Amino acid sequence: MSKIMTILEERVAPAVNKIGGQRHLRAVRNGIISMLPLTIVGSFFVIFLNVPIPGYDELIAPIKASLDIPFRYTVGIMSIYVSFGIAHQLAKSYNLDELTSGFLAVAGFLISSVVPTQVSKGVEGVIAAGRWMPIAKLSASSLFGAILAAIISVEIYRFFKEKDIVIKMPDGVPPAVSNSFAALFPAIAIILLFWVIRHLLGFDISEALSTLLAPLKGILAGNSLLGGLLTVFLILFFWVLGIHGPA
């Protein structure tokens, strides 16, 4: 037993620590954890909506739609918060402007994931005519797309900063204004990239990732021994990286 522990400490632990400390994985972990307060509060309202007491549904019927709102604007659009949080953490590791990086990531994610719906004729009391943004694509179903958009956006921003392809303002300009103009070229590149991919080429990053992961989901969702073993392995693997696997 002591020999096994020695091997784990000397060979396995350093490799695992190196993986867990990888810049992008650390940003993903910390970015997701940063929205934990919103997740917890939003989940409480789900409990309030589903209390298993006879007659409870009738009791809350007048305010049921209102009770659902906090969940919809926390967990229901969690991909927006995650993209901002991951970009913020990754930018911090690169000594980039965190706030600007977060905004760029959110813009990139929204452009790459959401296609506005055009309602030409509204229905009174139901929906008004105009362009609507479906929030279903902003939930956990687009989480992988949000992660990818955040990483790509920050890496593009870093590339422009390192190559000094930025608009430089005079010394007397406030830092907030200077940082905003410095991010102008990266913003153009990020927005154009995701716009071309999603709206000109019609390529949905989130859907593509879901399709690629579909075989894995099939194995994990099945009742086979392989599915059970793989599920446990992935849970433990994410724990090693500092990410709560079941969550």
Regions found by a protein language model. Give the residues of each.
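Signature of multi-pass transmembrane helix bundles
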Residues: 2-47, 54-244
